[in-house]
A protein has these predicted regions:
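Conserved mixed alpha/beta catalytic, RNA-binding, or beta-rich assembly cores of soluble enzyme
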Residues: 1-189, 200
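N-terminal basic/disordered segments at the start of proteins
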Residues: 190-207
């Protein structure tokens, strides 16, 4: 993600160094995770807990890759798993484990889809002073994060228009502007266009 490398450079080349970074969904945020791994070894993922009801977090990219491979599929087919993971003691344990990780983290990475669902369980005490990385941050999300005590919001989607537009809209605009047929562009090509146009990511200070 060019946006994160740009921010790292712009904010003194040490903003993400050794930061404790928590991902609500590593599978949805793989690109961000790979970039953050360049600056910090302290990456934690909640995929196993939130997807499969396992009261244990995933530490590091290698463990995430193991989970995202065959292990995740196997867990989805474990007989009787739901009887255990849906029990109140297990759900309480998962909520406690995830909340502790959120509280200890400096940076939270939140997918655009399911944004409010991920954050609704948490209070100002949990999110106060955090940096949030997400995409396509509309005004209602800025107000929501402000009320939660978040210090910094990093919107990885550059703002091309007067109103915030989603990633798919921006990709469509770039394809038309540079005469790129749908399906021919790669992520690297779109990233190069964004970099050459010097479109800065949004850094928002809601408080």
């Amino acid at each position: 993600e060019w946006s994160l490398r740009h921010i790292q450079f712009k904010l003194g080349n040490n903003y993400f160094n050794n930061a404790r970074v928590f991902f609500f969904s590593g599978r949805s945020s793989r690109t961000i995770a790979r970039v953050m791994a360049e600056y910090s070894d302290n990456l934690t993922f909640a995929d196993a807990s939130l997807e499969n009801g396992i009261p244990r977090l995933i530490d590091g990219l290698k463990e995430l890759e193991r989970y995202s491979g065959r292990l995740r599929d196997v867990l989805n087919w474990v007989p009787g798993k739901s009887m255990l993971t849906d029990s109140e003691p297990v759900r309480s344990m998962i909520a406690h484990v995830v909340r502790q990780a959120v509280q200890k983290s400096h940076v939270l990475v939140i997918p655009h889809h399911g944004f409010f669902k991920y954050l609704d369980p948490y209070t100002v005490e949990d999110l106060n002073g955090k940096t949030v990385i997400t995409s396509t941050v509309y005004d209602d999300r800025i107000d929501y994060l402000k009320d939660k005590g978040v210090d910094v919001i990093i919107d990885t989607t550059p703002k091309l228009l007067s109103n915030v537009a989603g990633v798919s809209v921006l990709e469509a605009i770039l394809r038309v502007a540079f005469d790129i047929s749908k399906g021919e562009e790669s992520d690297e090509e779109l990233l190069e266009i964004i970099s050459n146009m010097q479109m800065e990511p949004r850094i928002i200070y809601p408080s």
